[in-house]
Amino acid sequence: MGLSDDEWNHVLGIWAKVEPDLTAHGQEVIIRLFQLHPETQERFAKFKNLTTIDALKSSEEVKKHGTTVLTALGRILKQKNNHEQELKPLAESHATKHKIPVKYLEFICEIIVKVIAEKHPSDFGADSQAAMKKALELFRNDMASKYKEFGFLG
């Protein structure tokens, strides 16, 4: 299920367009996640009181978390599936501390693709989208495997 060199080139090529503005991309991903899947917001005590779109948009914590999420994802993507060292601590914290279900990873990965497509329509064509979806599926599957190692079946 691995990606070809060409697919990784697509993934890393678009990621190079995302990286200069991780904050805006990350903020949009988190806001969209909470809007489309409100149950995900309930996992974050610090975001529970942000009940309007304006509150989410003006929250420095939402911006910070979005940046953190995309920074971690970028480090993992750049490893081109040799991401054990990056993935293990992320999976451990999400499985044992935060208890984030794998389904939520699926939600956020779908949203990441949509946000990139909206922000970079001319650079994120069908081949790049397919490659990114494949890379994110690989990430989710590897996270799910690690979850099992940590005894979390989420």
Curated annotation (Swiss-Prot):
GO terms for biological process: removal of superoxide radicals. Its main location: cytoplasm. It holds the Pfam family Globin. Heme b binds at residue 94. It is an enzyme of class 1 (oxidoreductase). It catalyses: Fe(III)-heme b-[protein] + nitric oxide + H2O = Fe(II)-heme b-[protein] + nitrite + 2 H(+); H2O2 + AH2 = A + 2 H2O. Nitrite binds at residue 65. This is Myoglobin. It comes from Chelonia mydas (Green sea-turtle). The lineage of its organism: Eukaryota, Metazoa, Chordata, Craniata, Vertebrata.
